[in-house]
């Protein structure tokens, strides 16, 4: 059963939440982060992308970057932009996108639950990305970005959160330029905290929706702290990592599309003929071909959009991973036809997440005379089944929207 405990969040003072809240560090590039930081001195990107406050030639993984992140975090606390609560609390975090509401609870998951697979994963991580966040967490002495978790809520837990919302005023309520509304309620009542903790203990598993690298890094820092503190009790803050848990059926997964920069030395005609071996192909004149069901793909190649429907032998009788559209595409097109052996490391492939328009795929493909593929979104049910079976998805199979903002909650590793 899941351990999910209250904590003393370091969080924006009243009136500062909208200015502080920032997209996750890995959603914005260096130039975008620098532009945001230049306009907004309170943006949490000064912590999560601290290279913006160093000379432009500074390497992203230089020790100076992590030290600057630590300095910037301390400065935000010293100047009163961030203030720590004086007792452990839970926090309701509600996001509204295009009229759809998702309501989660912020707290701290256990590194032991991660190690024992109560916190379930569905993706591999890259060691270089892990090391970056390990250094960031360790030097800052804090989890600065929440892990996006999902689970099957109990009815009582949902009722507790709704009741608290009705009876209390939100601490934060702001809408950002992307028209996503963020609301936070602080649950500081002892009885409510105890009830929520009890309900969380009834939940058998938590699923990482987004944030595999942040989670793995937080756990490794926790294990490092245990080695440094052999008399640890398990109650120390470093035994836990910052998370927000949502009901799985409230989450939205968008498509994660692919663009390959060339045709692997082949002609357009050769590529089309090879793809026809495994797909029923229909040309779609004049506009992007958006897949409307599982096992359908949109493809843009040489000025034309095509709708591809996988032949049944590609997925019938396969396990849940083998039936994923991202796996089918890798197994019969990206690998054997286009030569993308390892999509994690091959620089010829670009992944384009969720909210980007299909016209952008077309533009990217045209720039290098490559090919683009639009996928149908993976379902939460497939994600959870894969995690339950301890299997792994291909990289970049899921794109969650809306993204949780960093800076709304910080979990200090020394309490």
For each predicted feature, which ranges?
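Surface-exposed, charge/polar-rich loops and edge strands
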Residues: 1-415
């Amino acid at each position: 059963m899941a351990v999910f405990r209250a904590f003393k969040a370091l969080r924006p003072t009243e009136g500062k939440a909208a200015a502080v809240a920032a997209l996750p560090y890995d959603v914005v590039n260096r130039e975008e982060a620098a532009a945001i930081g230049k306009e907004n001195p309170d943006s949490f990107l000064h912590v999560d992308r601290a290279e913006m406050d160093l000379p432009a030639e500074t390497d992203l993984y230089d020790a100076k970057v992590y030290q600057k992140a630590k300095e910037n975090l301390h400065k935000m606390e010293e100047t009163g932009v961030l203030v720590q609560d004086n007792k452990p609390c839970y926090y309701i975090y509600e996001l509204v996108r295009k009229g759809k509401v998702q309501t989660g609870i912020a707290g701290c998951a256990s590194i032991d639950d991660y190690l024992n697979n109560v916190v379930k994963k569905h993706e591999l991580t890259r060691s270089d990305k892990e090391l970056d966040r390990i250094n960031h967490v360790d030097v800052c002495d804090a989890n600065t970005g929440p892990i996006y978790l999902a689970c099957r809520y109990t009815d009582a837990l949902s009722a507790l959160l709704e009741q608290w919302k009705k009876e209390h005023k939100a601490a934060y309520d702001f809408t950002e330029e992307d028209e996503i509304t963020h609301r936070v309620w602080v649950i500081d009542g002892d009885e409510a905290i105890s009830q929520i903790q009890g309900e969380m203990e009834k939940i058998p598993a938590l699923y990482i929706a987004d944030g595999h690298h942040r989670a793995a890094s937080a756990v490794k820092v926790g294990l490092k702290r245990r080695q440094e503190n052999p008399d640890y009790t398990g109650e120390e803050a470093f035994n836990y990592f910052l998370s927000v848990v949502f009901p799985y059926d409230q989450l939205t997964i968008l498509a994660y599309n692919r663009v390959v920069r060339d045709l692997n030395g082949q002609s357009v005609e050769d590529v089309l003929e090879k793809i026809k071996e495994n797909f029923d192909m229909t040309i779609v004149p004049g506009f992007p071909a958006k897949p409307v069901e599982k096992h359908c793909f949109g493809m843009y190649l040489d000025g034309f959009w095509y709708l591809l429907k996988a032949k049944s032998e590609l997925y019938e009788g396969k396990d849940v991973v083998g039936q994923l559209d991202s796996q089918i595409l890798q197994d019969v097109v990206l690998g054997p036809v286009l030569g993308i052996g390892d999509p994690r490391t091959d620089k010829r492939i670009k992944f384009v997440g969720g909210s980007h328009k299909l016209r952008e795929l077309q533009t990217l493909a045209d720039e290098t005379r490559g090919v683009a593929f639009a996928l149908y979104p993976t379902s939460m049910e497939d994600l959870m089944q894969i995690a339950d079976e301890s299997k792994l998805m291909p990289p970049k199979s899921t794109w969650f929207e809306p993204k949780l903002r960093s800076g709304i909650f910080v979990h200090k590793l020394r309490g």
